[in-house]
């Protein structure tokens, strides 16, 4: 008999108030192949894309959908071609939308999109980083072409929604790697967090909207 695991998923795209919009289920545990890592999930985070995918339509389905991108956990087993990690390694990552999500006890992920969990972060803290950090990184350094070596040091960068997940990471990347002067906006309840991210030797500010 194959081992099983607990997961959270849905069969139908129902309003979140519906009792079957998200279900606790017992499913077969996955088996690693190729360069897969089988990760015992210790923490996950929820992103806006999770709500969008769960609300993708009204059609009933017979296939279980497991949500979740971000995860942090411990490698339990590896596929035969895996070479970057070994059982016992602590890792974090944003998974793939081509595979079941991370809202489960055991999750398969290609080792090439996985990183070692920072030793100074808890599993919960590490799980909060991947998707927001990737989004902020790609926006600044790949789309906008901001230098990671400080070639644009001292220039001003406006970040809207500076207290949010992506915004708070974007501020820190802009300051640490880009050495930019950051101007960020935030709603009044979030202004304290935003100010803590923008504070530095520069005369930076956080506008309150």
Task: Map each language-model feature to its residues.
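Eukaryotic N-terminal low-complexity, Ser/Thr- and Lys/Arg-rich leader segments
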Residues: 1-5
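Glycine-rich beta-strand-centered segment in the early N-terminal region that forms part
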Residues: 28-45, 55-98
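A structural motif shared across PLP-dependent enzymes of the aminotransferase-like
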Residues: 98-111
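Glycine/charged-rich beta-loop-alpha catalytic/anionic-binding loops adjacent to active sites
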Residues: 113-123, 152-154
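C-terminal boundary of histidine-terminating zinc-finger modules
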Residues: 124-128
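Mid-domain Rossmann-like dinucleotide-binding core that forms the NAD(H)/NADP(H) cofactor-binding site
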Residues: 129-204
């Amino acid at each position: 008999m194959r081992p099983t695991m607990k997961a959270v998923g849905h069969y139908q795209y129902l309003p979140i108030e519906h009792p079957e919009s998200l279900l606790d289920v017992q499913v077969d545990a996955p088996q690693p192949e190729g360069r897969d890592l089988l990760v015992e999930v210790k923490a996950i985070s929820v992103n806006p894309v999770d709500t969008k995918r769960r609300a993708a339509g009204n059609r009933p389905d017979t296939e279980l959908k497991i949500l979740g991108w971000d995860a942090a956990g411990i490698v339990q087993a590896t596929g035969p071609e895996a070479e970057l990690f070994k059982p016992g390694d602590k890792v974090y990552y944003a998974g793939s939308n081509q595979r079941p999500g991370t809202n489960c006890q055991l999750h398969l992920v290609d080792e090439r999109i996985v990183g070692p969990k920072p030793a100074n972060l808890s599993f919960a803290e590490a799980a909060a980083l991947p998707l927001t950090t990737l989004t902020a990184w790609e926006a600044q350094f790949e789309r906008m072409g901001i230098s990671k070596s400080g070639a644009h040091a001292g220039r001003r960068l406006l970040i809207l929604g500076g207290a949010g997940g992506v915004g708070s990471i974007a501020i820190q990347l802009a300051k640490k790697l880009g050495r930019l002067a950051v101007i960020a906006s935030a709603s009044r309840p979030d202004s304290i967090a935003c100010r803590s991210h923008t504070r530095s030797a520069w005369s930076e500010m956080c506008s309150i909207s």
